[in-house]
Amino acid sequence: MLSPNRFFLSATAGIVFSLLSSLCVAQETNALSLRTNIMVNDHRAFTIIPGDLDPDEPIPWVWYAPTLGKGLPGQHEIWMFNRLYANGIAIAGIDVGESYGNPKGVAIYQALYDKLTRENRFSRKPVLLGRSRGGLMLYSWAVRNPSSIGAIAGIYPVCNLISYPGLERAAPAFHMSAEELRTNLGKLNPVEMLAPLAAAKIPIFHLQGDNDKVVPLGPNSKLLADRINTMGGNAQIRVIKGQGHNLWNGWFTNEELIRFIMKFAKPSFD
């Protein structure tokens, strides 16, 4: 018969071993490696679909942008994608190149949405997750489709063409001169087109650094949130002091962000 002390040590060792085993399994899971590549309108797209989904329910999902070549999404997204995958939430995205949210890119986004929701049983209300210039791409689609969104999340997302990439650089993507683009900002620049998102009260949550020189807080996340909330909408910005436009791990392992995403992608999570 084991003495109380030996029993305690044995039980403790068992618990520790069990926890370590669970951690090893979690570390071995790389949702990004489970992606399936598909083609939509001659553009490369991907899906990551968890197993053991309810066949009678729409598949909850997160729409990630930007999807660019083999680099994005990449290693920095693995922690987030693993959390989503483990909680039964799919991830998808499509490569539209450096569209800056132009009408052609918006049309391709619509083609992806239609394919996934009509042919693959994906939910009609995904959570959009835009990182950096992915914000322009997703917001340009979102402002035109407020009834097709569960929520919008962002990691230092671009919201304003004037701020990034600037009108001179963006204009060729729109087949316009910079001056022509400036004249048409009211129907092409997401931060000028927010009324539908405010009216629909789409939940919005951004992480943004106060030292971002590439996508500054003021003309992007702050301007968007101020305008949305002034119109009665629902936008929150979590400002990270001292951080800029970088690959700090805290952007990609933020518990508040991932819980926001999961709450609106899969309401049963909350």
Mark where each language-model region is.
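Conserved alpha/beta-hydrolase
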Residues: 81-100
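C-terminal catalytic histidine-bearing segment of alpha/beta-hydrolase fold enzymes
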Residues: 214, 218-270
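The feature captures the conserved acid-bearing segment of alpha/beta-hydrolase catalytic domains
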Residues: 162-230
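Short, surface-exposed "cap/lid" segments of acyl-processing enzymes
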Residues: 51-83
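A domain-start/cap signature at the N-terminus of enzymes
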Residues: 24-57, 170-172, 266-270
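Primarily recognizes the serine-hydrolase "nucleophile elbow" in alpha/beta-hydrolase
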Residues: 117-119, 124-172, 176
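Alpha/beta-hydrolase active-site loop
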Residues: 100-121
